[in-house]
């Protein structure tokens, strides 16, 4: 079950929180859900070069409060706050209302320990036609420097322009998908290449969260019982 279900949805209410927090009349739920989807799409399209990791939405009466988690807060804020103002005006025009929109920009402290930013980095490199094995190896090195407890990367599609699509994955450290208290960050991105679309999935294990404690507890290192998947991956990568 832990291998199939979405890692974030599986842990909602345990170690993960909902990305949209609001209450509304049942008749307005479809309308507000569509608004949330439009807001996220607009922000991701407008700030596609700002390293957006997460977008949180809260509604209070007629006020919408947005929390934008980004690796480059300066790009979002702009000179003198002009970027925030343009974003707010664009959202008001998109929603077609004069509701008050408040934008909070939160900096991601460690971009290499964030699954969304890691998947975005891999996608950008693949779109530049860099060998996927080299990209995955670089991503693993960046994750190791960020001192995460485990990372798993999966790339699917016509890798390196191969005729037959396939799936390759590599894991370093522990990624316990069945453990509900495990703080696992997950992201899915696509890369548009000349050969077609590549799917990228990233799981990052940051430690275990005990109820009543906010910080993740470092998991004890496990003894490897067999040849690691990364070694197998590197052995096959000698030819390409």
Curated annotation (Swiss-Prot):
PROSITE patterns recorded: KH_TYPE_2, RIBOSOMAL_S3
Gene3D superfamilies documented for this protein: 3.30.300.20, Ribosomal protein S3, C-terminal domain
SUPFAM superfamilies: Prokaryotic type KH domain (KH-domain type II), Ribosomal protein S3 C-terminal domain
Segments forming domain KH type-2: 39-109
Gene Ontology MF terms: mRNA binding; rRNA binding; structural constituent of ribosome
GO BP: translation
Region: Disordered, residue numbers: 219-240
UniProt-listed InterPro entries: KH_dom, KH_dom-like_a/b, KH_dom_type_2, KH_sf_prok-type, Ribosomal_S3_C_sf, Ribosomal_uS3_bac-typ, Ribosomal_uS3_C, Ribosomal_uS3_CS
GO cellular component: cytosolic small ribosomal subunit
Keywords: Ribonucleoprotein, Ribosomal protein, RNA-binding, rRNA-binding
Bias kind Basic and acidic residues: ranges: 231-240
One Pfam family per UniProt: Ribosomal_S3_C
Subunit structure as annotated in this protein's UniProt entry: Part of the 30S ribosomal subunit. Forms a tight complex with proteins S10 and S14.
Family stated for the protein in its record: Belongs to the universal ribosomal protein uS3 family.
Function description: Binds the lower part of the 30S subunit head. Binds mRNA in the 70S ribosome, positioning it for translation.
Record protein name field: Small ribosomal subunit protein uS3
Organism whose genome encodes this protein: Synechocystis sp. (strain ATCC 27184 / PCC 6803 / Kazusa)
């Amino acid at each position: 079950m832990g291998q199939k279900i979405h890692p974030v949805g599986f842990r909602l209410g345990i170690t993960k929180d909902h990305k949209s927090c609001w209450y509304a009349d049942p008749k307005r739920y479809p309308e507000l859900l569509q608004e949330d989807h439009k807001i996220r799409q607009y922000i991701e399209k407008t700030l596609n070069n700002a390293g957006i990791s997460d977008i949180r939405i809260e509604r209070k009466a007629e006020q919408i409060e947005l929390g934008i988690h980004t690796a480059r807060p300066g790009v979002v804020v702009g000179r003198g706050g002009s970027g925030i103002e343009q974003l707010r005006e664009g959202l008001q025009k998109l929603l077609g209302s004069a509701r008050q929109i408040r934008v909070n920009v939160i900096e991601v402290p460690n971009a290499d320990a964030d699954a969304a930013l890691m998947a975005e980095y891999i996608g950008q490199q693949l779109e530049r036609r860099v060998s996927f094995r080299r990209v995955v190896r670089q991503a693993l090195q960046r994750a190791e420097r960020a001192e995460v407890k485990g990372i798993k990367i999966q790339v699917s599609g016509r890798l390196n322009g191969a005729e037959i699509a396939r799936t390759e994955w590599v894991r370093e450290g522990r990624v316990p998908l069945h453990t509900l208290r495990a703080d696992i960050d997950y992201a899915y991105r696509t890369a548009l290449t000349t050969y077609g679309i590549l799917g990228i999935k990233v799981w990052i294990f940051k430690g275990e969260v005990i109820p009543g404690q906010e910080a993740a507890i470092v998991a004890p290192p496990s003894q490897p019982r067999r040849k690691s998947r990364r070694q197998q991956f590197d052995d096959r990568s000698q030819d390409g």
